[in-house]
Amino acid sequence: MDDKITNVLFAGIGGQGIIKASDMLTEAAFRMGYDVKKSELHGMSQRGGSVSSDVRFGKKVFSPMIPAGEADYLVAVTEDQIAVCEEYLKPGAIIIRPSDFPEEVANSKMLNIAMLGRLNRYLKFPEDLWFELIRQSFKAEIAESNIAVFRAAANKEA
């Protein structure tokens, strides 16, 4: 394990599963043996307020907040959040956005899980770890649908 800190910024609107997705990434990174820090910012979701979550992991992480210009990844559950978060992105940052997915996924309640699948193309955590976390986070009938969406997004089918 090198000294690199990986910075993932999640952004969207209240109710879109931003916190659920960032919680799952936090747990996955922890189970992979990383030191993990997480922060959340909750807007007024009843009025379409922004919600964001910073997840930072590496050998040793001291602050939960991603400094401006250091986000490696942006997981934006709404397209308009990309401009809002731009100052946090490092040059060459990977942006995962709804338009990366077919309409039936982009407009579903499983978009956050699909985005984790797409993110895992870069993180390369074991799929079985993600499937276990999905099963722990959702009821059985919902979990299997989420696993299918995760798998498709991770394997470039969605």
Language model feature labels by segment:
Residues 1-158:
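Active-site cofactor/cluster-binding pocket
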